[in-house]
Curated annotation (Swiss-Prot):
Gene3D superfamilies: FAD/NAD(P)-binding domain. This is FAD-dependent monooxygenase nodY1. Its EC number is 1.-.-.-. It holds the Pfam family FAD_binding_3. The gene is nodY1. Its cofactor is FAD. The keyword Plastid does not apply. The active site is at R188. Keywords: FAD, Flavoprotein, Monooxygenase, Oxidoreductase, Signal. Residues 1-21 form the signal peptide.
Length: 431
């Protein structure tokens, strides 16, 4: 592709950073990507939970490498459109619609997705530097830069994709707002389906394995479990989102967990033995207990001089058990790369402000229902009280069927006109 002359420093090499680096490279920008972890295995949350890539993100990544990435993802296509809800006795009480069929929807292990995306970035020759600690950063009217491992690096802009505890947030957003504990945490892990086949207590999760993916919710007064099968019936992943007794003093970083930690909040459930059969099959040392952090609405994602922008969890961490967080991160990456392409080297601050305008309102609307849904899931009544239906919070078409790339090209000039005219940009593709 032709070079745009735009140079970009991407901070963070989780899914947000990797996707940003790839999208910027494909648009002809020069990219250096920095990651403090020593290698890919230590980046962010590379654990054995699952990631839902919905159609809005699948249409982006499946095209990479002339379809090679899509081919690699095919083994993880999500072919189920319904979720089953069980009560704490093990009785199925509800079926809810969760997705429309699509060839670009994937339910994949996080580590597998990260590896596929990273391998593609390597084939493109992107400059990715692990073990890089940023000690300082700055912006001027014509450039931005970082001091990393004793070296100064400069570029036309910095894209901060370094997660909920972003190093650049204070200066970029002009806010001291810090993530706080939500009052919830979740323990996550996975197991091989093959390891469950001889256990009679695990047969309930094996129904249809290899034919259709299973998605099961078990809400209760002390925890809300999500159990899914994926990869053509090869894997089962599970999550226990539980209430934290003292969130103000609770840990704010991930720690190793055990099967007993996972089971502790559900000791009184009659369904416990069947759940335990699945959880105990997880490889030793593979479970992680992670606090769910939340961040209020930032006043801005773009720095005062327009040379730095926050994307992904650095700007809008997905609340609680959102199934769409990773898909929105991929959209962010695609949009900022397109805006830099259209604006060109001489208008980088404008490009970042346009990208913010296009994404800001949409992300705000995406997150409105998620805290409410999570609270409802922990207030589902139990059989002895009369079952209260599990809340359905549909993934609206303007989210799952959105084409962020087409939309960015269509809206770019409108947003530029609004910014230059000092008017508010009004998004029309949300409801």
């Amino acid at each position: 592709m032709a070079s745009t002359g735009v140079s970009v420093i991407v901070v963070g090499l989780g899914l947000a950073g990797l996707t940003t680096a790839i999208e910027c490279h494909q648009k002809g920008h020069s990219v250096i990507a920095l990651e403090r972890s020593k290698d890919l295995n230590y980046v962010g949350k590379i654990i054995d939970d699952t990631v839902m890539i919905d159609n809005n993100a699948g249409v982006i990544v499946s095209k990479w490498g002339n379809g090679a990435v899509g081919q690699a993802l095919n083994a993880w296509k999500f072919n189920n459109t319904q979720a089953s809800v069980y009560d704490t006795t093990g009785k199925q009480v509800q079926t809810i619609e969760v997705r429309k069929p699509s060839s670009n929807k994937y339910l994949i292990l996080r580590r597998e997705l990260t590896k596929i995306v990273y391998d593609h970035a390597k084939t493109l020759g992107i400059d990715m530097r692990f073990g890089t600690e940023i000690s300082d950063y700055w912006e001027e009217s014509d450039q931005a830069g970082v001091s990393a491992n004793g070296q100064k690096l400069q570029a036309d802009c910095i894209i901060w994709a370094d997660g909920v505890n972003s190093k650049g947030r204070d200066s970029v957003a002009g806010s001291s707002l810090k993530p706080t504990h939500s009052g919830y945490a979740h323990i996550r892990g996975r197991a091989d389906i093959a390891s469950l086949k001889g256990n009679p207590d695990a047969q309930w999760i094996l129904q249809g394995a290899g034919e259709v993916d299973q998605m099961i919710f078990v809400p209760g007064p002390t925890a809300c479990l999500t159990i899914v099968t994926c990869g053509g019936g090869r894997n089962v992943a599970f999550s226990n989102m539980y209430k934290v007794e003292s969130p103000n003093s609770a840990k704010t970083s991930s720690t190793p967990a055990t099967a007993q930690d996972f089971l502790k909040p559900i000791q009184s459930w009659p369904f416990k033995a069947n759940i335990e059969a699945v959880v105990q099959a997880a490889p030793s040392g593979s479970l992680v207990d992670e606090p769910v952090l939340q961040l209020g609405q930032l006043p801005s994602w773009v720095s005062p001089q327009g040379r730095m922008i926050l994307i992904g969890d650095a700007s809008h961490p997905s609340a609680l058990n959102s199934p769409i967080g990773e898909s929105l991160v991929i959209e962010d990456a695609a949009v900022v790369a397109i805006c830099l392409e259209l604006a060109g080297k001489g208008n980088v601050p404008l490009a970042l402000r346009v990208a913010e305008k296009i994404r800001y309102v949409k992300q705000s609307n995406n997150n409105k229902n998620i805290p409410r849904a999570s609270a409802l899931q922990h207030n589902v009544e139990q059989p002895d009280q009369g079952i209260n239906m599990y809340p359905e919070v549909p993934l609206r078409d303007w989210v799952s069927e959105h084409n962020s790339q087409e939309h960015a090209y269509e809206e770019y000039d409108k947003v530029v006109k609004a910014i230059r005219g000092g008017k508010e940009y009004v998004a029309t593709n949300i409801s």
